[in-house]
């Protein structure tokens, strides 16, 4: 299905002029959005809790800092640059009671809205601007005159101009320099979670560990297994990122190509694809979100146990030793 890509020429940045943009939180995304907005000539305030260590850093960047509730009261557009786990409590205690009709809530990810861990009042706009890059990349590309691609979505269009706000914000942080695609909160949330779980984080980590374990159990040195299953992964991912799958294939050896084409389907077979569909069902039904929220509220015991086991895998110790030898880093 063809999608429209919005670029700088399609968006009126003047729509944000005269409006106050509040960035709640000053982590990687909050830092990038706040500085890019400021450098685009927007009026920006940062909302942080009293005693936050980020206050000094924000002020050092010539940004006005207020406590969260005060920042909300002073603003027209409120960007929640907070982790999914912390966002509901901050919203309930500091944001909800200080909102007024006609303001806009802006998110970088759809989780809180789609799974209703936050339920905004009905007399405000609710939009999303999701740069497809980490915070430091969003900032660095902007500073260098470029931008990262992004997604926008409108959940509630009370004013009739919510999309205009999302596009203008996208332009102010540099995303329309590369291109912005319109989606929905549902589609962004479901595809983002699936990508993280099945491919980018869960799938890749499990595949690397399984390959490492297979070689070590077969009698090969752990160092050799690390190089072949983890270290060299970056080279292939970089090729795919820059040139696509076919471009990567053009640049690897004939031996590697034949192995990819004949053995790859044995590893990621129909059983794995069936499991991927089950993972997607859990995301779409809300089962994953319910389990995640329940675990966070219950003290994270299972999470900490799983994290400890993953962090204690032998590949971690081997990797630390080998990375120490890489003097070019």
Residue ranges of predicted features:
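Rossmann-fold dinucleotide-binding core
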Residues: 106-197
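Glycine-rich adenosine-cofactor-binding loop
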Residues: 19-33
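Active-site-proximal catalytic alpha-helix in oxidoreductases
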Residues: 160-164, 173, 179-218, 223-241
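A short, basic/flexible loop-to-alpha-helix module at the beginning of a structural domain
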Residues: 1-18
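Interdomain hinge/lid region at the active-site interface
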Residues: 210-213, 217-218, 243-303
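NAD(P)-binding Rossmann-fold cofactor-contacting core
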Residues: 32, 38-61
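Rossmann-fold NAD(P) dinucleotide-binding segment
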Residues: 67-118
């Amino acid at each position: 299905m063809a999608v429209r890509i919005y670029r700088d020429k399609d968006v009126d940045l003047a729509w944000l002029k005269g409006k106050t943009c509040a960035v709640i939180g000053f982590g990687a995304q909050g830092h990038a959005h706040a500085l890019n907005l400021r450098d685009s000539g927007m009026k920006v305030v940062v909302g942080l809790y009293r005693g936050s260590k980020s206050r000094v850093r924000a002020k050092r960047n010539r940004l006005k800092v207020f406590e969260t509730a005060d920042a909300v009261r002073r603003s027209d557009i409120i960007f929640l640059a907070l982790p999914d786990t912390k966002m509901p409590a901050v919203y309930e205690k500091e944001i909800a009671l200080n909102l007024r009709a006609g303001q806009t809530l802006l998110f970088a990810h759809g989780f809180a809205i789609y799974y209703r861990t936050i339920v905004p009042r009905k007399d405000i706009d609710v939009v999303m601007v999701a740069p497809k890059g980490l915070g430091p990349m969003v900032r660095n590309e902007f500073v260098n005159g470029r931008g990262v691609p992004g997604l926008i979505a409108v959940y509630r269009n009370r004013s009739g101009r919510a999309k205009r706000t999302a596009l203008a914000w996208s332009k102010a942080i540099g995303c329309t320099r590369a291109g912005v695609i319109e989606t929905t909160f549902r589609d962004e949330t479901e595809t983002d979670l699936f990508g993280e779980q099945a491919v980018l984080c869960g799938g890749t980590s499990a595949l690397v560990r399984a390959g490492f374990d297979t070689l070590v159990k077969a009698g090969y040195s752990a160092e050799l297994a690390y190089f072949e299953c983890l270290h060299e992964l970056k080279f292939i991912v970089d090729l795919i990122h820059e040139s696509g799958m076919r471009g990567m294939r053009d640049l690897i050896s004939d031996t590697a190509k034949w192995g990819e084409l004949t053995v790859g389907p044995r590893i990621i077979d129909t059983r794995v694809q069936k499991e991927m569909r089950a993972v997607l069902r859990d995301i779409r039904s809300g089962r994953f979100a319910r389990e995640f929220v329940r675990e966070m509220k219950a003290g994270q015991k299972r999470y900490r146990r799983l994290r400890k086991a993953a962090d204690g895998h032998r590949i971690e110790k081997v990797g630390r030793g080998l990375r120490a030898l890489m003097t070019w880093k």
